């Protein structure tokens, strides 16, 4: 059994819209609705949205097809996940944690991630892609044998690490028990005090828990939309698929 948590509490100031970011229209539907549809198409029916800014407006727009958890203060992606109650269903399931602003993600990619996670019996599996454009995402660091050794947020990366084009964009699946067991080990960022979920990768690797990365071909599936220009770019990418 798998459960999905979508991080949708952001305000989306750069969108320059009067709407909360998750419900900004994209190709005729709210951004987060595309992600919900992809999960349902992949057979994942138990979906929780973590909401914050404009929470009631988001609930009214998306409706009762998903569950809701409030993040009253936005203190990072790991902090958002910590707002979800640790139910036995969560602890005994595989738990997707996806950002709620990447509407090009497909059901096939979701199924591919889940299949690899189950097949390898990993504690954590996440999506990556080779990005031909420079974006401010975490770098996936591997050793000379190609083994995953770390994921480094862009602002903490060295000049050499910044050259890495394999990027991580916060599309995870976890064993539920391992996710919640390790969340409390994440320390606040020294710069802004936020709790980053990407830090759980290093924590798990240090404990010799199995962490897997699944690289997909189309990096555009992983791109988060933050500005009106991003919306235009993503709509053009969607039309080119048809």
Model-predicted segments: where are they?
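Left-handed beta-helix
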Residues: 1, 192-242
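N-terminal nucleotide-binding beta1-loop-alpha1 segment
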Residues: 1-17
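Hydrophobic targeting segments
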Residues: 2-6, 32, 46-49, 227
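A conserved hydrophobic helix/loop-capping motif in glycosyltransferases and polysaccharide synthases
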Residues: 5-9, 25, 35
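Short catalytic helix/loop segments, enriched in acidic residues and glycine
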Residues: 18-34
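Short aromatic/basic micro-patch
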Residues: 25, 104, 173, 224-225
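Conserved N-terminal catalytic core of the sugar/cofactor nucleotidyltransferase
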Residues: 29-100, 104-110, 115, 119
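Conserved core of the sugar-phosphate nucleotidyltransferase
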Residues: 105-191, 200, 209, 214-216
